């Protein structure tokens, strides 16, 4: 496949494949997390919890709008916020719409996609609809904290169930959202890309397509992350952050049950449309070899004969910055089978 060019990957010859062992260094996710904190926490963005509650409806000139709301999640036993894009025709008539669910990354929240420094993505979506590049859709951004959209070991903070059960029910009972997997797709960026892939892989009964920008593809053997004493402060921070999700020490079984690369090796993914991309200038390529992990996912899917789209963008960055440049590509892919 030509790098940087969209390519529909289909069947390939089977063969033995292994993840590069260097991914299991002691600095994999500790560095990811510490660098995410540094890059995501910027001036004017310190009090995320207050911002969640203060946001008012964003009204666009076309009549489209973004609403901010919350509901009680049984899976989390707490109230959770979300934002939703409603197209210009939503305010009149009785039309029902397909739904795109989109998951944010570490230290972001459900409001991040609407702020200037991330490209005012709601305006991009509205423009794409106006130009008939995608059909009219609802687009939902749930607050996911730093959960990797995974059920916690305590059995009470069940973030995967929150997305796959509570959120879908909330949207379909509150808004004119079409039900059924053919009308639901899921995307995300960074940690949210991880969540979108793994949820779609596990629950293709709920979602017909998935798209992930700069997805965090986890290392093969999580026990190697804390195998030595280097970067002890970062390891301690990582351990505390990830312990509720994967246990302390990390439970390899739970890890592989949620790792997109591991899931891609064993699950039947045929019938699920899959798109993912990353930039060769992604800050995590040098730090943790993110590009290697993503290319490994491409290779596994190809070897298993699972059709998918994989795009490598030359000299482009990580996360929302990449999304702002290529959301049109992923949305066009996700919405391809929706009725206009």
Where are these regions (language model features)?
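Intrinsic low-complexity/disordered segments
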Residues: 2-5, 32, 37, 101
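Intrinsically disordered, low-complexity regions enriched in Ser/Pro/Gly/Gln/His and often acidic
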Residues: 13-16, 30, 248
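Bacterial N-terminal signal peptides
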Residues: 22-31
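Non-catalytic cap/lid and distal C-terminal segments of serine-dependent acyl enzymes
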Residues: 36-340
């Amino acid at each position: 496949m030509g790098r940087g060019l969209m390519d529909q990957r289909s069947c390939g010859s089977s063969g033995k494949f292994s993840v590069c062992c260097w991914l299991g260094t002691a600095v994999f996710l500790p560095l990811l997390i510490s660098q995410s904190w540094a890059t995501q926490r910027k001036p004017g963005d310190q009090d995320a919890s207050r911002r969640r509650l203060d946001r008012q409806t964003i009204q666009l000139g076309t009549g489209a709008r973004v609403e901010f709301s919350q509901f009680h999640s049984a899976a989390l036993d707490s109230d959770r916020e979300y934002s939703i894009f409603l197209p210009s025709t939503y305010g009149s008539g009785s039309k029902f719409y397909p739904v795109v669910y989109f998951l944010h990354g570490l230290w972001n929240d459900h409001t991040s996609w609407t702020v200037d420094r991330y490209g005012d993505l709601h305006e991009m979506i509205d423009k794409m609809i106006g130009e008939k590049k995608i059909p009219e859709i609802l687009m939902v951004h749930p607050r996911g904290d730093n959960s990797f959209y995974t059920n916690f070991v305590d059995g009470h903070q069940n973030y995967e169930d929150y997305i796959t059960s509570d959120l879908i029910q909330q949207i379909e009972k509150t808004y004119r959202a079409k039900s059924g997997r053919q009308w639901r797709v899921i995307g995300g960026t960074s940690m949210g890309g991880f969540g979108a892939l793994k949820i779609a892989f596990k629950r293709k009964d709920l979602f017909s397509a998935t798209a992930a920008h700069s997805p965090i593809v986890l290392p093969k053997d999580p026990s190697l992350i804390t195998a030595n004493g280097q970067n002890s402060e970062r390891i301690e921070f990582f351990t505390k952050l990830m312990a509720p999700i994967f246990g302390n020490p990390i439970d390899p079984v739970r890890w592989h049950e949620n790792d997109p690369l591991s899931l891609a090796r064993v699950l039947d993914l045929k019938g699920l449309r899959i798109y993912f991309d990353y930039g060769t200038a992604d800050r995590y390529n040098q730090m943790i070899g993110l590009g290697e992990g993503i290319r490994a996912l491409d290779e596994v899917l190809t070897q298993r004969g699972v059709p998918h789209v994989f795009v490598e963008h030359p000299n482009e960055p990580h996360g929302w910055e990449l999304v702002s440049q290529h959301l049109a590509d992923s949305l066009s892919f996700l919405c391809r089978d929706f009725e206009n």
